[in-house]
Amino acid sequence: MAEITRTSQVPKISRDQIVKIEFWPVDIPITDPFVVATGARVVAENIFVRITLHDGTQGYGESAPFPEVGGETRDSCLTTLRQLAATLIGESAGCYALLAAEMAQTAPFHPAARCGLETAMIDAYCRSTQIPMWQLWGGQDVRSRETDITIPIATLEKSVSLARGWYAQGFRLFKMKVGNDVDQDIRRLEAVHHSLPGISFIGDGNQGFSREECLAFAKGVRRFGGALVLLEQPVVRDDLDSMTAIRRDTGVPVAADESVRSLADARDVIAQSAADYINIKIMKTGVVEAVAIAEATLAAGLKLMVGGMVETRIAMGCSFSLVLGMKGFDILDLDTPLLLATDPVQGGYGYRGAQLEPWHTSGLGITTLPQSDLTTIE
């Protein structure tokens, strides 16, 4: 890794000066195997981050690598965190945007690691100024919001069983993981459709379809009368021509997910009219760049979706803060804490069925306790 070039240094001790950074691995079982077209997880192998400021304020962040999607592993994140954390000691948390840009220069291929530090910095800064994190982004849309629920790739019977359980809790928008077998994917959606009235589907291919397979999938869902409201990343990330063709030939809106891992990627998708939505995920880009991508998306007249990897309410709370702070997020895919067997976080936003409920305390409003294998940088 290259060394960060210092563009500013805090000349005197300030109340928001970073004095200590701690991080530790957390293993959280996933209730049902999280199977997507590119791989499967049964345990969320994440990292929690805590930053302490000179005035004693503490902020929390989370790194949630998903190797099958982003290429990062927990080990690579831990290595990157050790290197980047040392560069933040003595800096002002209020300079989070500048520090995020410097970290992106130094570790461009480790966004999940950077995201953990960015989130903790921003959380600490918001707590020190006594504002909820969503207020930092404008506080323009503070209200309860509905999320979808994810059904992983599974047998037909398991898919129906999972969907019925979530339906009973109030979920009506089902994000179906697809992309392994077109015929089986169609059968799974059809079985869920006939089991539950008044539902809609997102088909999330995770790059698993070819153009022809995706067209066949959309046609098959239309044939049985399913409400397919979105096709998320149906083909490989660089195949923007197919994304454009799928939009045109199916009439179903398309969301770019893996295709957008940077602001430059977002501009390419926009220029080629390859998507109707861009899916904002802080683990793909870090928090500050996610905000820039969201702003560029809205300015270009596209719509916003927000999602995540397999995250707890720390990272997901940061993403929800963008929804509450900025206008324009139409589709929320902020469900992964519900897929975990335990919740290691106290406070913050909450779930009421399919509704996410805002919080009004400072920062993310959450706390959690360090576990074993604690690393401290000061």
Regions found by a protein language model. Name each.
Residues D16, Q169, G226, S273, ...:
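Structured loop/turn residues at beta-strand edges in well-structured enzyme cores
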Residues K327-T336:
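Short helix/strand-capping turn motifs
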